[in-house]
Regions:
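Active-site beta->alpha loop and helix N-cap motifs at the rims of alpha/beta catalytic domains
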Residues: 1-41
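Generic detector of well-ordered alpha-helical packing
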Residues: 10, 122, 151, 203-206
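Catalytic alpha/beta core domains of metabolic enzymes, predominantly
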Residues: 37-170
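C-terminal active-site "lid" helix and adjoining low-complexity regulatory extension at the edge
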Residues: 168-180
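Extended, charge-rich alpha-helical interface modules
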Residues: 178-232
């Protein structure tokens, strides 16, 4: 009715069969499937030789080898239109993100597969709609190829992940506010590399500030413990 492309997550060969039968345009493999070589192989066997777009989300935990292994299994299945989705990684620590970005791991993946399309999922990384823009801009500054942002007509009434969804109007505004570096062909490579390196520094600065914050919190706990035990 709309002419829009359709996409769905597949977690086993039966999902793949149904998706192909209904001519779904794009398939993605979720983070919890990426962790299992057995599931990935099952999906790869069913998709062998397909020209459908197939995207692989990073595994739940920050394990680059698992992510690479999943990509290589799908490559061996001669999947012609393969890409990856960065949705962040789970952590036991409390941070402002639902899933920490660990941008350095994605940069390593980019270096290994420079021609592989890379999509960022800021909705799952942030878990909060008010952080989506900043993470999206960081992804574009790191030369990501696209974004996967959750939208809902009435986000607060969504059955799942309500806090990380935006209205269509909010999505339009996010897209308008995002900036993509535009340069001449002669300058493009230099400025792209320079911008990426500067983004790397920004990421490291954020990590350092986060570590210092955690250090201060621990020092404060030590102070409270000493005070409670009357220790100078």
């Amino acid at each position: 009715e709309t002419g829009l492309k359709t996409a769905t997550e597949v977690a086993n060969k039966d999902h793949v069969k149904l998706a192909l039968e209904h001519d779904i345009d794009m398939l993605w493999i979720g983070a919890r499937s990426t962790v299992s070589p057995f599931i990935i192989q099952e999906i790869a066997d069913e998709l062998e030789g397909t020209d459908k777009i197939v995207l692989v989300k990073n595994p739940v935990n920050p394990d680059l080898a698992l992510w690479i292994g999943a990509i290589e299994r799908l490559q061996r299945a001669n999947i012609k239109n393969l890409g990856v989705i960065h949705r962040g990684f789970s952590t036991y620590e409390k941070t402002k993100y639902r899933n920490i970005p660990e941008w350095q791991l994605v940069i390593e993946l980019q270096n290994k597969f420079p021609l592989l399309p890379l999509i960022c999922d800021p909705s799952h990384i942030t878990g909060k709609r008010d952080l989506i823009f900043d993470v999206s801009q960081t992804a574009l500054d790191l030369n990501f190829d696209g974004l996967m942002i959750e939208t809902h007509c009435t986000p607060d009434e969504a059955w799942s992940d309500a806090a990380q969804q935006v209205t269509p109007a909010q999505l339009v505004q996010i897209m308008k506010d995002l900036r993509i570096r535009k340069t001449s062909v002669a300058e493009e490579d230099y400025l792209s590399q320079l911008g990426t390196l500067r983004s790397h520094i920004d990421i490291l600065d954020d990590q350092l500030l986060d570590l210092l914050k955690k250090r201060m919190e621990i020092a404060e706990e030590i102070g409270k413990l000493k005070k409670a035990n009357n220790v100078a």
